[in-house]
Amino acid sequence: MFGEDSDVFRVRVAGEFPKSTPDSLIAMEWCEKATQLEIKTAKLRIDIGIDVARYGDDSSVLYVVFDKQKSGEIEMHNHNKTTEISGYAVKMIKRYAAAYPEASIHVKVDCDGLGVGVYDNLDEQKERIVQAVWEDRCREAGLDPKDGNQWRDCQDVPELDLHIVECHFGGAGGKVDDDDPIEYVNSTGLMWGAVRQKLKD
């Protein structure tokens, strides 16, 4: 009933510390193993998640994931207007567009509250962001996008593939997959279940 991999065996027989608590959703051992993995990523897709807190005790967070596999930098900002958070997002988009010109960028904004203002602002600015990134790329290639004589050459410079996505994290739950014994009540629980499954695998 309690094999060598169980915490009962570890504590009572081997005299070791348990690897998880009975009520843990995600075992610490899985997290520790996951931090040791080296994930090579082509950086063809960049997701930027934005959770807006505005003036509360919480922080607004911008979080980057490459190819749905590897985390990038985390930016945290306190006591900012939604327009300021939009500005931080635009800077981040431009920074990653310059560093990874072949990547598509998907900005996912939590719109279950204050984030809807950031979403609206970014969605409204989308064409201007794409244009500004394209002009920067032209200049990087030694071209002047404002010079009519270089217009034809500038057309060979690729535009940024940018997506602004409205997300709602309080939605319906379900199972991570058909074999999952756990039915999650909402999308937040489902998200944690997916993380748990990835770490377990």
Summary of predicted features, one role per range:
Residues 40-41, 55, 100, 157:
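Generic structural signal for beta-strand residues in well-ordered domains
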Residues 1-50:
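ATPase catalytic-site recognition across NTP-hydrolyzing enzymes
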Residues 14, 63, 165:
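Residues in well-ordered beta-strands of folded domains
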Residues 41-66:
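Gly/Thr-rich phosphate-binding beta-strand-loop-beta motif of the actin/hexokinase/Hsp70
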Residues 68-201:
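Mg2+-dependent endonuclease catalytic cores in nucleic-acid-processing enzymes, primarily RNase H-like
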